[in-house]
Every structure is written in C-alpha cells, then in structure tokens.
UniProtKB/Swiss-Prot annotation:
Toxin complex is secreted when grown at 25 degrees Celsius or less; at higher temperatures the proteins are present intracellularly but not secreted. It is found in: Secreted. GO terms for cellular component: extracellular region. This is Toxin subunit YenA1. Disruption phenotype: Cells with a disrupted yenA1-yenA2-chi2-yenB-yenC1-yenC2 locus are no longer pathogenic in C.zealandica larvae. Residues 106-131 are annotated as: Disordered. Keywords: Secreted, Virulence. Semipurified toxin complex consists of at least YenA1, YenA2, YenB, YenC1, YenC2, Chi1 and Chi2. The Yen-TC:K9 subcomplex is about 26 nm tall and 22 nm in diameter with 5-fold symmetry and 5 copies of YenA1, YenA2, Chi1 and Chi2; the chitinase subunits may be solvent accessible on the exterior the complex. The Yen-TC:K9 subcomplex has no insecticidal activity. The native complex with additional YenB, YenC1 and YenC2 subunits is 16 nm taller and is insecticidal; the toxicity-conferring subunits are present at about 1 copy each. Disulfide bonds: none annotated. It comes from the Bacteria.
Amino acid sequence: MDKYNNYSNVIKNKSSISPLLAAAAKIEPEITVLSSASKSNRSQYSQSLADTLLGLGYRSIFDIAKVSRQRFIKRHDESLLGNGAVIFDKAVSMANQVLQKYRKNRLEKSNSPLVPQTSSSTDASSESQTNKLPEYNQLFPEPWDNFCRPGAIEALDSPASYLLDLYKFIQSVELDGSNQARKLETRRADIPKLSLDNDALYKEVTALSIVNDVLSGSAREYIDQSGQADKAVNQILGDTHFPFTLPYSLPTQQINKGLGASNIELGTVIQRVDPQFSWNTTQEKYNQVLLAYTQLSSEQIALLSLPDVFTQNFLTQTELSAGYLSASTTEILAEKDLSRHGYIVKAADNIKGPTQLVEHSDASYDVIELTCTNQAKETITVKLRGENIITYQRTKARMVPFDNSSPFSRQLKLTFVAEDNPSLGNLDKGPYFANMDIYAAEWVRENVSSETMVSRPFLTMTYRIAIAKAGASLEELQPEADAFFINNFGLSAEDSSQLVKLVAFGDQTGSKAEEIESLLSCGENLPIVSPNVIFANPIFGSYFNDEPFPAPYHFGGVYINAHQRNAMTIIRAEGGREIQSLSNFRLERLNRFIRLQRWLDLPSHQLDLLLTSVMQADADNSQQEITEPVLKSLGLFRHLNLQYKITPEIFSSWLYQLTPFAVSGEIAFFDRIFNREQLFDQPFILDGGSFTYLDAKGSDAKSVKQLCAGLNISAVTFQFIAPLVQSALGLEAGTLVRSFEVVSSLYRLVSIPQTFGLSTEDGLILMNILTDEMGYLAKQPAFDDKQTQDKDFLSIILKMEALSAWLTKNNLTPASLALLLGVTRLAVVPTNNMVTFFKGIANGLSENVCLTTDDFQRQELEGADWWTLLSTNQVIDDMGLVLDIHPVWGKSDEEMLMEKIQSIGVSNDNNTLSIIVQILIQAKNAQENLLSQTISAEYGVERSVVPLQLRWLGSNVYSVLNQVLNNTPTDISSIVPKLSELTYSLLIYTQLINSLKLNKEFIFLRLTQPNWLGLTQPKLSTQLSLPEIYLITCYQDWVVNANKNEDSIHEYLEFANIKKTEAEKTLVDNSEKCAELLAEILAWDAGEILKAASLLGLNPPQATNVFEIDWIRRLQTLSEKTMISTEYLWQMGDLTENSEFSLKEGVGEAVMAALKAQGDSDNV
C-alpha cells in the first residue's frame, strides 16, 4: 500500500469506482508518455490505471480535485506510470463541469415561482406575471437546510471545524515530508488525545501556558530517563546551566513579577515582615534583605559564587622549565604610582616564600617551596625560582646611569630548575598539583600618621602548578575541565577550543557580534579617559608604556580580564574573526559575567564598573571574585536603582571613586559632575595638587568654587564637610588635594543624603545618629566580616533610607531627632528671662495656692491634727505643697488620695475623709494650675499636658515647685544647675509633644501603662530613646487611621492585657475575642489577625501592645496591597537563598494567585 493512503480498507472492486473517475483514468496509448522505468517493464502498463487509483484511495474525481496539482503529481506520478498530470487535469475538468451543471439545476429550481399560476390569481394579468423579473432572494435563496445552531460545534466556523481542517492540512503537509521528519504526533503527542469538549474549544488560555505544558511534558520524559524522577521540572531547570538562558527558577520569577506588579520588592517584604523592623534588625536579617533585593534565584546566586574551577595561570613543569614570564603589572592601576613595587607570596600551609617586600636584596632570585599533591593525597616538594624582571629602555645618550626610580615594566618570572629539585624522582604517580597566589604589592605607609612602610597588595595572580611526567594528557592535567565546559558551554573540554572563534562563542552563549564587542570593550566600544585628569602613575606619560591607554583592563573589561594585561580583543584570522588572549580562566569569568549582565539588564561597561568598584570595597577580595559582600552590594544597587534611579556610576562612586573613564561616544562621569558646564575659564582638573579650602581668594578659592558648583552646594555647606574629608584622609589642617579620594569623599557626603531627600547637613546628622560618627561617609567603605551592623555600609544605607522616610512621614527633621535623642545638645546659657520665669513661679505660691494649718480648722475636722497627720504620712510638706501622687490607669486623683488618707487609719467617717480629699485636691489643682500656666506661656505647650510632661521627663509638679521655693534665683549667677537642666528638658519634650501632636490621654497611657506601648525600658528620664519615639509615632498613626476612636483603642488594650491566673487561662481563651475587637479597629479580617499573632509566637495569640499591633498593621498593609495572605507573607519573610524549593514554589504560586485575584491575568 502507498504511504499516502490513509484509508483502512481499500476498495478493490472495479465496479465500485465512479464512472467519471474511470473515464479520467482512460488514457489512449498514443498520448501516453512512459517513464524510463516503465519502458523497462512494459508488463506493468497493462494494469488498469483505475485499479491503481482505487489502491491509492481515490474513488471519485472530487477526491482528486481536493489535492493540489503539484502535490498529486509529486505523490502518484510514478505509480500512474507518468500519467499523473493528464489524469489530474481530466479529473479537475470533469469536476468543474459537474459543479457547473449542479449550479445550473439549482438556479432553474429557484426560478419556479415565475411560472404563471392558475389558482386564485385572477386579479393579476398573465402578461404581468410573465414579465416579472426575479429578485435576489429568489436567485440566491438561503440554504437553510445546511445551517446549524449558531456556536454549535458542528458549525462550519466553529473552533472544532477550524481545528479539524488545520489538523487535516498538517497531515497532508506531513505526507510530503521525508521519513526522518518529526511529525506533529511526535512534537505534540497531546493533540491526538485531545477531547473536543466545551473546555477545549471555548476556554481561553494563553499561548505561554500551552508552551509551558508541552515543554514540561517533554522535559518530564527526559528527566525521568536521566535518573532524577524525584525532582520537579522547574527544579531541574534551576540546576541546569546550559544554554545561557538557564538556570531558570519559576518560583523566583513568580515572586518578583507578582510583587513588582504591586510596586514592591521581596527585600522590602522581608524587612516589613521582620518583627524588629527597623532599628533593631540583626545583621543576618539585613544580609537576607540585601540578597533578596538582587532578585536572583538561589541557583543563580550559587552559579555566580561557585569557587573558581580554573586559575588565572596554569603552568606545567615543561613551561616552568622554559621560564614563565607574567604580563607587566606596572600599568594595572592608573591612579597609583607603581614605580616601586614587587611580588610576594600569599601565606599558605603548602607554600614557603617571601611574604613581605624587601627594600634592598643582594639575591638575584627568591626560592618558593611548593607542596604538591596527587589524587591519592601523596605529596612532593618542588622549588621554584621567583624573579622581579624589569624592562628598561635606555635613552640614546651614552653614559646615562640606570635610574631605578623611573617608571618601567615589571614582570614576575617563575622558573623550575632541575638542580634545585634533585629529589623529585619518579613522577609515575602524578600528576601532582599545587595552587599558589602571588601578590603584586606596593610600599605604603602603615597608616596616615605613621612613617613605617609595609607591603600592600594591589593585584592577585593565581597559579595552578602541575608536575607530571612527559606526555601527560590534557584530561590528566585538567580533569575538572570537561565537566565545567559541558555544564556551562555545552561542549567537551576538547571541543572548547572552538570558543576562540567568534561565531562559535556567540552560538554557545547566545550573543551577537556587537554584544561581544561591547563585552570585550573593543571595536566601537573602546574605553576613553577624561582629558581633565593627570594620573599618579607616571608610566602613562612616558615612552615605557607600549599599549594604548586606557585599555579594557582599566575600564570596561576589568573583571573578565582579572585586572591584568593582555586583554581579550577580537582579531581577524584565516578562519574568520577570533577572540585573542582567551583562556579557560577568562571563559569562566565570561560565563558568570554574561549571565549576570542579562539578569541585571545593564550595559557591559556599567556592570564591569559596578563589580570592580564593589570589589575595591571588599577588603578580603584581592582576587576579584563575586563574593557575598559583592552580591549584597548588587542587591542594594538594584533596590536603589529601582526606587531612586541610582545609576551604576553613582553607586560605584559611593563604594570606590568617581570614574574618569567611559566608552567611546560617552562622557566620563567625573566630567559630568564637575565639568558639565563651562562656568569657569578652565575646567576642574585632578592634578594631585593641594589647596587651602579656607582661602576666599586666589587659585585655591577657585578650586573650592569649582567643587561647590559641581556638587551643587553652597560655600557654607562645603566648609561644613571639608574638615570631615580632611580628617578622614589624614590631610593637613585646612588643606585638601585635587585627587580622586577627595572628590569621591565629597561626592559621597553630598549625594547619599540627596538620594533620600535630605540636605547634606541633615544627612550627616542622621549618619551621626546611626554610627556615632559624623564623617562616616567621608571614608571609603570597606567590607569586613568583623564589622557589626552599626558599621556595615550597606546596612547603614538601608537604615538611612528607612529612617529618612519615617522622619518625613511624621514631620520630623534629623536635627530635631538628634535633639530628642541627646545626640546633639544645645548649650544652656542662664539668662534674665530664666530668673524672671522662676521668680514668677515662686511669687505665685501664695497662701491661696499653698496649704496652711488654717485650711484644716473646720468643725467637721475636729478631733484630729490633720496638718500633722498629713505631713507625717508624706501627703503634704511643711510649706503646704501637696506631694506627688503617682497616677494609676483607671483611677482618678481623688481615688488615689482617698486610698492614701484611708491608709492613715485616723477616721472611718466618709464625710470627714471626703472633706480632707477635697481640700487636698483644691490645693493640688491650684499648684498645678500655677505651674502649668507659667510653663504653657513660656514654652507654648497645652496647660493640661504640663503635669504629665513634667512626670515624663523624670520630674513632677511637687518636685519643681519645691526646687523653685528652695532655690529661687535672684540673678543669673544664682540659677542652680537643676533648674537650668529643667528648662532644657522642658524645651525638648515640648518639641516632641508639639511635633507629634500628643494629647494628655496618650501621655497618661505612656506614664501608667508603658508595657501597652511595648517599651522594654519604660524608665522616665530627661533623654528619649529612638525605640520610644518610634513607638509613639506608631501609636499616633494607628489612632489616625483606625476605624474606631481612641477610646476604643484604649478599651482594646485594657481588655487584651487583663491578667489571668493559670486556671483562668485554661478555662477562658480571649484570643478570638481580641482578634474580633482588633479587626473592627483595623478594618481587617479577624482570622488573619489571629493567624498573625500565632506566627509571631504570642502565647496566647493576641496582640497586647503597640509594638505587636504595629507589626500586624504592617502585615495588613502588605496583604491589602498584594492580596497575599498573612501566612504566605510570613513564609516570604523567611525566604533565603538556602530555602527549600517546595517553600519557594508554594510562595510563588500564592503570589500568582494573588495577582490573578487582582484581575491582572496578563502577568499570571
């Protein structure tokens, strides 16, 4: 049977063939054109062509007409002995004639109403009926019998018909394919099994979901066969590194995309879900937040931070015997004078060698001893000679002595000498390996004030030494190479040599040629340098430099070239364009860099600047690896870039320096800041010269003006920050230098506060609050594992962001906050106004205010000496002042006094006790009114608040009046310190009360129930703490946004804090009732509140103070903004790079469900 026959039972009986088809198959011998194959076997010609057509599945001429002429001939011409074209043409001709006849018959039938009628038509003449013309609906009547119900599956325009026709069309196309073609049933095995039900036909689904289902099914089959059937498809995609679109984490994408639709980040969610937000957050939590801000999955982070497989230099014994010579290191840093530098060994257990530079040495080389280890952990010791090679070009003048101070190229030379290794012996058990790091180090002062010179590395060169017998294969020398290249580039180690070709590299990495040029900083992306910078390294101004400046290892390609010479570039070779200076080590860096660039969506030169600047701040990262501090810095950058549009150039200048470099066609960032406009006759040039910033005239004053113009600050602000920079850099008093360090410090001090909407002065005040160091930002940041969160630059920036936003929300300023916290203290200078103030209080304490014995001379009080009794029991003092009555929540002063009087036990007569209480209350009110009126008039605070204000600052009405009476000043010199301190405290607390609009109800709650606020240290003092001020603002914000009034809030707190015995706790659980009450106040779901309290670990699960309720309100805000439940927000707050895949998967699905609930189906 022919492969094109789709029928299951072939009709072989000739009598069943259509007569017309038989006629079409009738070919006259004289017009038959036989093929060469037919001529060799003429017996086949006698076979009936009609039987052949039947065998091919054609029973009528219409079956042939359904197929195109070209396809019919291609399929059957050979089977029909070369008559395919003739038979097709005859069949189509006959089919057209039959169709025409059919249409003519239908037209004749449709004209039947025109025939003259003989019944009941006598009113119409026969002539008019005969001459009547046909109408359109008569000529073209609707074929109602062929119609079906609109929307029915069997309709011609239904999805089922379209799908069926499409499916048949694909089958017909596949018939023309070769036997090796992948047919639809192979590519989409689900389609033949698809049930044409209502869901399949009418339910709208995205093309992406179909693609995902198909690909997941295919991937599942492959995974099941690879022995990883226990892992989900998405988990495998995260563990796979090739192609370069992987690793892919669906949960991470869901979380980032879902939260992004609500304009929020995962790091922000983690911050707000943390109960300690935001002043007491631990360093571990900040690390979690910063890594979350990268928006990278744990698999992506793992790929970036994996230990290096290769070293910068792989040296075999043969290469060392010939003498290895490194690239020159003098040209590495443009901003440093490297005329005097050398090479030292990084100390390690398996290495012995020089670890410090030596000023003068008579030895021509140093010996480095390496302990090399084979696969069986057996060791040998190898000695290498290390030399500092200088390339010096003499001038043509004779008798010019060698000048060791001139700039010249320096290179490290390593040599294996057989005489130094007589015991090396047999290497059959090899190869033996050893890793070694060598520093290029410069001479520097130990610190800014020391004369002691020490070695400070500025470049790390990594080596892997392989000692093996002659003829060792590459697989033996680099056994780890094959797995690396297969996993990351899809090639074996042997085939990896193809990556040097530009086309092959682009194919394996998914990069275009122009993208590779940008990556390598070549072609149209060459680095350029500002013309307004004179670099400290003198080699670039001499004839000793044999390379263009700047080079890619200075800017644009620093990371991928490991900050070393012989930078990669594109050259033309016989086989096409190639990448020069490519190595396994650089391929490993390119592997990380290309992926990271796509994940962060940054141009290559900007990402390189970002990475290398961060690495400069990473003190223990001389090898320039992507470490955890680097990743955290990238997270902070991505957050600031998203929220504040901070560019890589700005962020890099914060961590290191303003860059003087750019790529072709752009302006260096340094010039964009300080030379963007021609305001002066000459541009601002970094020439390394010093200037006095205190001068008002001359060239030094011009430098100050240029700096002020570039930073967009006033001269007053500059004079405020200049001493901070001078102190941080150890410069002479009143002096700065036109250098990268100085301008970068000034830029940090100005730009970081501006990012968060603060002035420079306010930013420094805020930094002083956070770090206890005003000039913290003047110093270049340095990451150190020993740093606490109080000194960690990245954490401090996050704190500064949160603190500035909180201050703005509550109408506070950094200056006022510093005063409230006591960080900044104003000088208290006694004045005549103070004397008048205290004299007024003393003079007001007349007999109408102070109690006397006469006040108790009443008939109702006879029988007891109440003056003596009250004085003895510390209710009043000898001067008639009522002693302090400590307030209690829920009790009035009258009740407190009554309890005090009753405790004396003199009389049980309620009438007598009531009279005593009334006398005392009148006196107490008079004394409070006197002091309140005076303080209110002087400080502008509400009179009713004054008694509570005095108690809050650690004093009380009685204490103040007593001090005034005993120490009434007569002049400025007689004002005692306690009274001066009182005026200062009153000023500070008045500022807090007025700024936050605090009423006496809140202050009374603060004094009597500090635990309801959540204060861990409720002690009253003249100095406020940041947690207390923060909780006060939380309370105020709660009151303003509550669904109930402040009394309801107090009632809830009172109910939630009812103390119970253990037996009562067992019998009665008020948690649900508390959740319901709080739900009414917050206008939120009680179940969510109860769940939040349980997640917080409260026992019983009920919020009892403002600290806990503020945390619940933060969850409420997040939940309402994102439509994510409390439980999943809590899980989101626990997400780290080490979290289980199942946890991330659950959170990702919850985020997508919440996004769909918001009606955003496009992003689901």
